[in-house]
A protein has these predicted regions:
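Short, charged, surface-exposed hinge/linker loops at domain edges
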Residues: 2-4, 45-111, 115-122
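A short beta-strand-loop micro-motif that forms or neighbors metal/cofactor-
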Residues: 122-129
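A short, exposed loop/beta-hairpin motif centered on an aromatic-Gly-Thr core
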Residues: 24-35, 109
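Surface loops and adjacent helix of pleckstrin homology
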Residues: 21, 31, 122
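A short, charged, amphipathic alpha-helix used as a generic interaction element across diverse proteins
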Residues: 32-49
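N-terminal segment of the canonical double-stranded RNA-binding domain
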Residues: 1-14, 19, 97-99
Length: 129
């Protein structure tokens, strides 16, 4: 299922800050616009996935016309000037993203100390899982 949330992309000296107003100041950043968008997708997917895993409620997305970015950003930046920004919708299929990035198994071969191996064998630890 596709999840779509509005995000504020704020132009900073070092790139872009991305803030999801509906998700309690959830934010990320990127040096370029492309990187900021990739990070926004990853951030949104990770947040929604974690909420699902912890069975926490997720706030529904606002309609873009209901947002009040100047007020919201002023609250974040305080006395600093609000940077140039734009609003865009960020979408992600959390299930598909999780399968590819969060739930994917990776085979690794590693060396452990002999004492740790003996202890694991004593406790019946399955090294395959």
């Amino acid at each position: 299922m596709l999840s779509i949330y509005p995000a504020y992309f704020c132009k900073e000296d070092s790139g872009y800050s991305v803030i999801f107003p509906d998700l309690n100041y959830l934010s990320t950043c990127g040096e370029t616009l492309e990187e900021a968008m990739e990070m926004a997708v990853d951030c949104l997917a990770g947040h929604l996935y974690l909420c699902r895993q912890l069975q926490e409620p997720v706030f529904p997305p606002s309609k873009p016309e209901a947002l009040r970015p100047e007020e919201y950003l002023k609250n974040i930046y305080g006395d600093l000037p609000v940077p140039d920004y734009f609003i865009t919708m960020v979408s992600v299929d959390v299930d598909a993203y999780a399968r590819e990035h969060f739930e994917k198994s990776v085979k690794k071969t590693l060396t452990i100390p002999a004492w740790l191996n003996q202890e694991a064998l004593k406790r019946g630890l399955n090294f395959s899982k």
